[in-house]
Amino acid sequence: MVAVRRPWPVMVAMLLVLLACLGALVDAYPAKPEAPGEDASPEELSRYYASLRHYLNLVTRQRYGKREVPAALFSKLLFTDDSENLPFRSRPEGVDQW
């Protein structure tokens, strides 16, 4: 009989690579600031709100660059009014009326 070889070493290696990639993505995301607690001083609250504002600005910022180009091109093709740029002709040229 022929022994069937199981690909478990390959599956384990793929799982480890996937976990490493996911770990790198998690580290790239900014960490949410820790709340100071109920008995915090006004200076600590001020620092917390400043860091929270900075965190929210990072998370919700608009991203410019290559992602914007296809959408802008698509909207330009769909929503431009080309009738202003076309010359006005009441009759087709070269066609004799009878």
Swiss-Prot record:
Coiled-coil region: none
Species in which this protein is naturally found: Rattus norvegicus
Gene giving rise to this polypeptide: Pyy
Family membership noted in the UniProt record: Belongs to the NPY family.
Cross-referenced InterPro entries: Pancreatic_hormone-like, Pancreatic_hormone-like_CS
Protein name listed in UniProt: Peptide YY
Signal peptide positions on this chain: 1-28
Entry PTM: The peptide YY form is cleaved at Pro-30 by the prolyl endopeptidase FAP (seprase) activity (in vitro) to generate peptide YY(3-36).
Modified residues (Tyrosine amide): Y64
Principal location class: secreted
Propiece residues: 68-98
Subcellular location: Secreted
Modified residues (Phosphoserine): S41
The organism's taxonomic lineage, starting at the top: Eukaryota, Metazoa, Chordata, Craniata, Vertebrata
GO cellular component terms given for this protein: extracellular space
Pfam families assigned to the protein according to its UniProt record, in alphabetical order: Hormone_3
PROSITE patterns: PANCREATIC_HORMONE_1, PANCREATIC_HORMONE_2
Keywords, comma-separated and alphabetical: Amidation, Cleavage on pair of basic residues, Hormone, Phosphoprotein, Secreted, Signal
